[in-house]
Design a protein with these regions (language model features):
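Conserved ABC ATPase signature
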Residues: 126-130
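Conserved ABC transporter NBD signature motif
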Residues: 58-72
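Catalytic Walker B motif of ABC-type/P-loop ATPase nucleotide-binding domains
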Residues: 151-154
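Conserved ABC ATPase "signature" region
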Residues: 96, 107-122
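ABC transporter nucleotide-binding domain
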Residues: 171-255
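Short, charged/small-residue-rich alpha-helical element at the C-terminal edge
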Residues: 222-296
Length: 296
């Protein structure tokens, strides 16, 4: 079932167009990734979807609600790239202050969040004394305390170590499985985008491609087979005429449709090669194909 729609939303600051007529459809339980470089318009899009800023034009609906309605904000949780929590009070107070904004908070759920995000031992610490990873875990737990239908994460993994990312995403995946949580995140981390159900590639304020990760890879990414051989001419004679081949530093760089074709080809030329390496196409390949530049 569709949870959120955005129809031709735009944001203009004086003469500068930050977001240009973006359309979105988000289904319940999905993990949606906005992938793009810094300045692409990802955060501005999130800010419009969360009601932090108004659209210049276009329409946003969440379960039939408009961002100007109070009920809209009861259905969402937001974690901004830069924290908005009170640094002068404890972790526990920050979470409780958020909980008081809503009726019928489930204390068992709140305590489970605290446990799952590993916050039990730091509840009495002031927020401004925490490390970056600890702060981010508190930010996300606080945003979830009222059990929203939709969680917005703006660059959630920036500056975090691998272990902290693992804790965060392990907990979020658990909530997706048990409670049907829907997540929209902005990221320039390719690993995060790889896990999404659906990806919107954004550049210069526009959606330049949108589809499942699998389909985007099929359409834009290239699987690369690198071969070293003392008899390159014989190897070249076996290559499918539709494949792209480049000779570089004594190696053959072959773009192949999929790993099965690569395996079949390697079996044919095995006696002729001294070394090979196969690399799957990835999100960086997709972004390079679409924009001509790397995402990092």
């Amino acid at each position: 079932m569709t949870l959120l729609t955005a129809k031709s939303i735009s944001k203009t600051y004086r003469e500068k167009v930050a977001v240009n007529h973006i359309d979105l459809t988000v289904k319940e339980g999905q993990l949606i990734a906005f992938l793009g470089p810094n300045g692409a318009g990802k955060s501005t899009t999130i800010n419009m979807l969360t009601g932090l800023i108004q659209t210049t034009s276009g329409e946003i609906r969440l379960a039939g609600l408009d961002p100007k309605q109070k009920e809209y904000h009861h259905k969402i949780g937001v974690v901004f790239q830069n924290s908005v929590l009170d640094g002068q009070v404890t972790v526990q107070q920050n979470i409780q202050n958020r909980a008081r904004m809503y009726k019928n908070i489930d204390l068992d759920f709140e305590n489970q969040l605290i446990d799952d995000f590993g916050l039990t031992t730091i509840l009495d610490q002031r927020y401004d004394t925490l490390s970056g990873g600890q702060r981010r875990r508190v930010d996300i737990a606080r945003a979830l305390v009222h059990q929203p239908d939709l969680l917005f994460l703006d660059e959630p993994s920036t500056g975090l170590d691998i272990q902290t990312r693992k804790v965060i995403w392990g907990t979020l995946e658990k909530l997706r499985e048990t409670r049907g949580l829907t997540i929209i995140l902005t990221t320039h981390y390719l690993e995060e985008a790889e896990e999404a159900d659906f990806v919107y590639v954004i550049d210069h304020g526009e959606v330049i491609a949108h589809d499942t990760v699998k389909q985007l890879k099929e359409d834009y990414a290239q699987n690369l087979l690198t071969i070293e051989s003392e008899n390159k001419d014989a190897v070249l004679a076996e290559i499918d005429s539709s494949w792209s081949v480049v000779q570089e530093k004594g190696s053959l760089l072959i773009k192949v449709p999929n790993e099965h074709d690569a395996i079949d080809f390697l079996q044919r030329v095995e006696p002729m090669i001294t070394h090979f390496e196969f690399r799957h196409g990835n999100m960086d390949d997709i972004f390079m194909a679409l924009t001509g530049k790397e995402i990092r």
